[in-house]
């Protein structure tokens, strides 16, 4: 996908950038693979905000994506590359030879007419899904399972890829996009290639309204709030907040480690890169 810049006819258009969508071959989604999901606005079942700065946005239908790739041994033809409003990556519509249709995340260099397959005997080419045990070292992979049969959970964003760096015992060592090297069971499935739409991270939204179309509400600084709303709020005139930066609940930010999941620490060979 190339990046298209707009003419500066207004302040909002001056720095705005769009994708060209030349890889999209089908405009309307497959009816059998969509469903309507009610928006939560960042609230949980109790009605409390658990994820701030969410709400509004354009109406959208959820595409049912096959992250498990459990239809093994049956080849499928790529019928279309489609836009998905729920993610940065594109979707590939697969038509299996037995008549079933499924969506998968479209990797780089996957085009209409290509044949893809999943299973231990599949070839090493973009779009094919295999157990890590059957993938050569150094291969770029995405949509990686962390638990056997649960479906891909990591490396699914636009332009991302992981790399298989080692195999030892019943585990494989996978280098994730963050730089973290993690142990994953060799029986877990992964898809070959890099996730498509690589230029997605380079797009400039250009104006606040476009952020609202995506369902993202404004983020307000703590020092601009009142003391009742934030630990750094209040003060006469502008202030520094009077303490180290923190969240609205007093948790330190700016590099403070919050990871508490000690049960999975043993699977991390190397921690992620510092920002």
Swiss-Prot record:
Short name of any one Pfam family annotated for the protein:
Ribosomal_L2_C
Which superkingdom heads the taxonomic lineage of this protein's source? Bacteria
Q: Name one GO molecular function term.
A: rRNA binding
Give the start-end ranges of region Disordered.
222-275
* GO cellular component entries: large ribosomal subunit
Q: Which UniProt keywords apply?
A: Ribonucleoprotein, Ribosomal protein, RNA-binding, rRNA-binding
- GO annotation terms (biological process): cytoplasmic translation
Q: Provide the leader sequence positions.
A: none
Tell me the subunit arrangement.
Answer: Part of the 50S ribosomal subunit. Forms a bridge to the 30S subunit in the 70S ribosome.
**Summary of the function given for this chain in its UniProt record:** One of the primary rRNA binding proteins. Required for association of the 30S and 50S subunits to form the 70S ribosome, for tRNA binding and peptide bond formation. It has been suggested to have peptidyltransferase activity; this is somewhat controversial. Makes several contacts with the 16S rRNA in the 70S ribosome.
> Which NCBIfam families does its entry note?
rplB_bact
Family per similarity comment: Belongs to the universal ribosomal protein uL2 family.
- Put simply, this protein is called Large ribosomal subunit protein uL2
Give the species.
Desulfatibacillum aliphaticivorans
